[in-house]
C-alpha cells in the first residue's frame, strides 16, 4: 500500500484504504515506502491534497502498522481488541506511531521491526494496549486483552519459529 503517489491521493484517502485493508484480515500489509531501498522507487509527491506534513504522518502510520500489525502478527486478534476501544485501525496506528516516536523506535530512529524478536514486539504491543485501554477507561478488560495477545503470540511463535512457550494467563485454564 502506498501513499502520495497517485494524483488526487490524500491523507484521509490513505487512512480509509488502511481501515478497509485491516477489515479484510490480511496476513500482512506491505508499505514499500517504509522499506529500506524501496523508498526511491515510490517517492511521495507533495500536492494540494497531500502536504509534506501529511506525507510524514502517512509514513509514520504505515511504519506503525508494519511494526504492530505485520511484524507483531496481530492479524487474528487486531479487530477484536480494537472493538471495545471504539477506534478505527488508522487512528490506532496513528497513536501507536506517536508512541513509537516517544519510545525511540519509530521510522526516523532507524528501528527495524523485522530484526526484532517477536517477543519484543509483543511486549511493545502489550504496553501500548494497556495505555490505550486505560485512556479509553476500559481497564477492566486489560487482563483479557493481555491473554488474547499472549496466547496468539505463543501460537504464532510455535507455528512460525517452532518455539514452545509456557504462558501465564489471568484466569485458570482448567476452569
What are these regions (language model features)?
Residues 1-94:
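A structural motif corresponding to the C-terminal lobe/cap of the Radical SAM core domain
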Residues 60-175:
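Radical SAM enzyme core and accessory elements
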Amino acid at each position: 500500500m502506498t501513499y502520495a503517489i497517485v494524483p488526487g491521493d490524500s491523507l484521509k484517502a490513505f487512512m480509509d484504504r488502511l481501515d478497509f485493508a485491516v477489515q479484510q484480515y490480511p496476513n500482512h500489509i506491505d508499505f514499500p515506502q517504509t522499506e529500506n531501498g524501496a523508498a526511491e522507487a515510490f517517492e511521495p509527491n507533495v500536492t494540494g491534497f497531500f502536504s509534506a506534513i501529511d506525507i510524514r504522518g502517512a509514513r509514520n502510520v504505515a511504519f506503525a502498522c508494519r511494526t504492530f500489525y505485520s511484524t507483531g502478527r496481530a492479524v487474528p486478534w487486531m479487530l477484536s481488541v480494537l472493538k471495545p476501544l471504539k477506534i478505527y485501525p488508522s487512528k490506532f496506528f496513528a497513536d501507536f506511531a506517536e508512541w513509537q516516536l516517544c519510545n525511540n523506535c519509530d521510522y526516523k530512529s532507524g528501528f527495524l521491526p523485522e530484526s526484532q524478536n517477536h517477543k519484543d514486539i509483543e511486549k511493545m504491543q502489550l504496553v501500548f494496549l494497556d495505555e490505550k485501554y486505560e485512556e479509553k477507561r476500559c481497564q477492566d478488560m486489560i487482563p483479557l486483552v493481555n491473554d488474547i495477545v499472549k496466547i496468539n503470540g505463543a501460537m504464532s511463535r510455535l507455528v512460525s519459529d517452532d518455539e514452545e512457550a509456557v504462558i501465564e494467563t489471568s484466569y485458570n485454564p482448567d476452569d
